[in-house]
Amino acid sequence: MYQCRSRVRATGPSSPRRAPAGWIWSGTLDVVTHTHVAGSIHADATSRAPGWLPLPDDVNALLPRLWSQGVSKDADGVLTVAGVSVTELAEQCGTPVYVVDEDDLRARARTFAEAFAGWEVYYAAKSFLCTAVARWVAEEGLGLDVCTGGELAVAQRAGVNLSRVGLHGNNKSLDELRQGLTAGVGRIIVDSFDEIERLSALAAELEVRARVMVRVTTGVEAHTHEYIATAHEDQKFGFSIAGGQAARALQACADAEWLDLRGIHSHIGSQIFEPDGFEVAARRTLRLHAEHARATGVELPELDLGGGFGIAYTSADSPADPFVLARALRRIVEAECAGLEVAVPHLSIEPGRAISGPSAFALYRVGTVKQVLLDGGASRTYVAVDGGMSDNIRTALYAAEYSATLADRRSDAPPALSRVVGKHCEGGDILVRDEFLPADVRPGDLIAVPASGAYSRSMASNYNHVPRPPVVAVRDGEVATLIRRETVEDLLALDCG
């Protein structure tokens, strides 16, 4: 079993390369229609490449916005990150493996801190968290948004300033609330009347005044998958503004002796590219803020607009620049506050995916390759790798789209419509639904999937009793293990039968 050594020196720096164009493909392009994810492999049986997926001029080329800044390919087509080649990574760490570009993650955290200067920026730990990453984002000036006792324990272990930690969650246990209060977290985001009552009693018992924000739903339907759109009414998070529960929750917190009501929190979803949803949510939230001020004579000092900033998974995705987004949100908030005749509260946001996502890729080794004939004479290449839905469930869960590249050699073969699949006993075990890979992809090749830093390791499982891959960080030609590879022995140690 591979265990990546804690420090490895690379043999040399990477160098950019130019690759020729002129590939030929005889298939046709059409639009993929997704149905229920469990049957997606059958539903797509007669489909072609989706309309957003262009036939590449060069099947070896990388699209820079999908990758961390430290990634390139050398003249032989070998992918390198921060001076370390994927062939070295595979040899030293095994596959599958999540590979984090430390400098890139730090730079993205720093960019949000600079773009939203004067705001509080909390890194959304749910996207990816380990002790090292908690330290990195803190060192780059960010707070931390956690939503379980486990995530809070990582923050505590990392030694971050707990006054800059927010505790989220729609169903926090009494133990988690106690953990947050005794640790001294900077704020607890309350999500139900049950929680307000529970937290108020616990704070009185501990004689600790709990700083709270009220999570509201604004009724905004973000342009994203239903399961990650969190501000429409029919879902588990927050208090409805339209239904009046949000105003009642604010009053309940204001009336509670041991609660210090700081403000309102909203979050409209994830993987959002357009500012329109944020604009509507901010206006509705600020109206509630102003109504509470008129009713109580007290203007709440804080407002959190959440996160959900999208990243590029494919060539069809165009993420917003954080500086452009910051200017737009400032303008919206300032204009709305002026119209409502209230002071601008201290603002905060919670980026997660936008920091961790592009900073990492997943590296796999090909095990089998097969051709499947489609209607009309076209074909699809099924490339099976040594990972799958246990290390990235998003394609199966959300019909998420990803990209991939042949990572350890240059190919002169034409592009072939391919589907990268895993090793699990499940028809929906798909990692990359549609991609053009070289037609000569073969067993033993390395495949890299970009933008795998968010919600891959975080949502990983042990389906089929497969151990979870390690997470390694690369910086200045050195490799460090952040999370070691699980082993079958680890899994058996949990089995008490």
At which residue positions do the language-model features occur?
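A charged N-terminal "starter" segment
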Residues: 28-211, 256, 260, 441, ...
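Charged (often Lys/Glu-rich) extended helix/loop segments that serve as interaction or gating elements
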Residues: 328, 334, 342-497
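Short beta-strand segments
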Residues: 124, 211-217, 265-267, 304-306, ...
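Active-site-proximal loop/turn and secondary-structure-junction residues that shape catalytic pockets
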Residues: 127-129, 150, 171-173, 192-194, ...
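Hydrophobic residues within beta-strands of alpha/beta enzymes
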Residues: 144-145, 165, 188, 264, ...
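Non-catalytic peripheral regions of nucleotide-handling enzymes
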Residues: 1-27
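Active-site loop/helix belt of alpha/beta enzymes
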Residues: 31-61, 218-370, 437, 464-466, ...
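Short acidic, glycine/serine/threonine-rich loops at helix termini
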Residues: 133-134, 156-158, 177-182, 199-202, ...
